[in-house]
Design a protein with these regions (language model features):
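Short beta-strand micro-motifs within the conserved protein kinase catalytic domain, predominantly
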Residues: 60-73
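Conserved short submotifs of the Hanks-type protein kinase catalytic core
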Residues: 70-84
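Activation segment signature within eukaryotic-like protein kinase domains
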Residues: 115-116
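ATP-binding glycine-rich loop module of kinase domains
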Residues: 9-47
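Structural motif at the C-terminus of the N-lobe alphaC helix and the adjacent alphaC-beta4 loop
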Residues: 48-56
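Terminal C-lobe "cap" of eukaryotic-type protein kinase domains
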Residues: 207-213, 217-231
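Catalytic-loop of the protein kinase fold
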Residues: 123, 127-144
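C-lobe/activation-segment region of protein kinase-like
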Residues: 150, 155-201
Length: 237
């Protein structure tokens, strides 16, 4: 293990090298802090990460740590390029449930749309794999200036009940609401305003979960907006 790259409630992430027949390769290693954290059980996070599978907007997982000399649990992940930064900081005592964005964080609508599309695709992928992320916040998202993004941190993740369709739908709509909060924050960081995206955001936050759109509807709306002529631009974080 080398230098610390970051840490959260459930563990510490280190830069490391993975040995193979082809040589040493830089990776990131997450070691969990203990048997129980504020996010839950490390073994639950590990299971959810592995069950999530591969997706362009999820941080790739290469495997789990075994035979650690101190018996610690951990995961081996891809080392993400330094151009990716955390979208926002966790909530403060003042904001309670809302993440804290740097005052300098501004997006074009194109970049905000690209982030929204990536996270919506990742969330839909997780749900089809039976995984509920449980912490769909900006502080768990890495992004770069073109709007490429990665969703990480499965500390609060859980598995959807396979034989209870009603409960699955309700849990998915809770995550849709979380996406609505994220979309609202992204739009607040845009100088330009867009009525279509604001309407989608408001539907995601509807007080009646049954009125909230499905992930398929969200994807279709974002794709339609993108096809209407919104092209990615380069912004500064």
């Amino acid at each position: 293990l080398q230098q610390v790259l970051g840490q959260g409630a459930s563990g510490i992430i280190y830069r490391a090298h993975r040995r193979s027949e082809q040589g040493n390769h830089p990776v990131a290693v997450k070691l969990f802090k203990g048997a129980l954290t504020s996010d839950g059980l490390p073994r639950s996070e590990k299971a959810a990460c592995i069950a999530a599978g591969e997706h362009p907007h999820l941080i790739p997982i290469h495997g789990k740590i075994s035979a650690h000399p101190e018996g610690e649990l951990g995961l081996v992940m891809s080392l993400i390029a330094s151009e990716f930064v955390t979208l926002a900081n966790p909530p403060s005592l003042q904001t309670c449930t809302r993440d804290v964005y740097a005052p300098s964080t501004r997006f074009s609508l194109a970049v905000a749309l690209r982030i929204a599309q990536g996270i919506a695709q990742a969330a839909q992928h997780l749900h089809t794999r039976g995984v509920l992320h449980g912490d769909l916040y900006a502080h768990n998202i890495l992004w770069n200036v073109t709007g490429e993004c990665l969703l990480g941190d499965f500390g609060a993740a859980s598995f959807l009940p396979p034989d209870d369709v009603v409960t699955v739908m309700r849990l998915q709509k809770i995550e849709v609401r979380a996406f609505g909060c994220l979309l609202e924050e992204l739009l607040q960081c845009c100088d330009a305003k867009d009525a279509l995206l604001q309407a989608l955001q408001q539907r995601c936050l509807h007080v009646n979960p049954e009125v909230r759109p499905s992930w398929g509807e969200i994807q279709a709306c974002l794709a339609e907006y993108s096809a209407a002529g919104c092209s990615c631009e380069t912004d500064s974080p």
